[in-house]
Curated annotation (Swiss-Prot):
TM helices/strands, residue ranges: 3-23, 41-61, 66-86, 107-129, 143-163, 168-188
The protein, known as: Putative manganese efflux pump MntP
Lineage, highest ranks first: Bacteria, Pseudomonadati, Pseudomonadota, Gammaproteobacteria, Enterobacterales
InterPro entries, A to Z: Mntp/YtaF, Put_MntP
Cellular compartments annotated: Cell inner membrane
Keywords, sorted A to Z: Cell inner membrane, Cell membrane, Ion transport, Manganese, Membrane, Transmembrane, Transmembrane helix, Transport
PANTHER family registered for this protein in UniProt: MANGANESE EFFLUX PUMP MNTP-RELATED
GO cellular component terms, semicolon-separated: plasma membrane
């Protein structure tokens, strides 16, 4: 996977956390930068670990399905992309809209895990490709840190305008990456 695809994947994977952060930021009157950064660090750390876990699980199975790797990655990315788009259109669940006010560490970790399950599934798909998983996971974590921090800070301004549309954009990016993987397989 080239650097452009890695960056697109990283920011695509950060969209769930970004959408959750916008919702949480929209509930704050004047979020402090320290609150936003704390949220970004927690979301980013979890989002770095989950693709590594998924990649490890995928590596266990890779010897059995190596000849199908492009299809596995394509199907996972398209499935996740469609799911994100559907959630964006439907509006997701009400948990994402609960106030951030002085959230405990564990509540933030739980929210981060909930928004990073897609990254774990993507990690499974990445196990079937020749990628530097450490660099990819770090890119996903950094993008999530940036987008979550930004989401908290600007959430109250753009929450009503963008909200779950961030998930739609993230889903479209995942579908595009899946299509690129399949295209590259068939057209070299």
């Amino acid at each position: 996977m080239n650097i452009t695809a890695t960056v697109l994947l990283a920011f695509g994977m950060s969209m769930d956390a970004f959408a959750a952060s916008i919702g949480k930021g929209a509930t704050l009157h004047k979020p402090k930068f320290s609150e936003a950064l704390r949220t970004g660090l927690i979301f980013g750390a979890v989002e770095t670990l989950t693709p590594l876990i998924g990649w490890g699980l995928g590596m266990l199975a890779s010897k059995f399905v190596l000849e199908w790797n492009h299809w596995v990655a394509f199907i996972l990315l398209v499935f996740l992309g469609i799911r994100m788009i559907i959630e964006g259109v439907r509006g997701g669940n009400d948990e994402d809209d609960e106030p951030l006010r002085r959230h405990s560490f564990w509540l933030l970790v739980t929210t981060a895990i909930a928004t990073s399950l897609d990254a774990m599934a993507v990690g499974v798909g990445l196990a079937f490709l020749q990628v530097n998983i450490i660099a990819t996971a770090l890119a996903i974590g950094c993008a999530t840190l940036i987008m979550s921090t930004l989401g908290i800070m600007v959430g109250r301004f753009i929450g009503p305008l963008l909200g779950k549309r961030a998930e739609i954009l993230g889903g479209a990016v995942l579908i595009g990456i899946g299509a690129q993987i399949l295209w590259t397989h068939f057209h070299g």
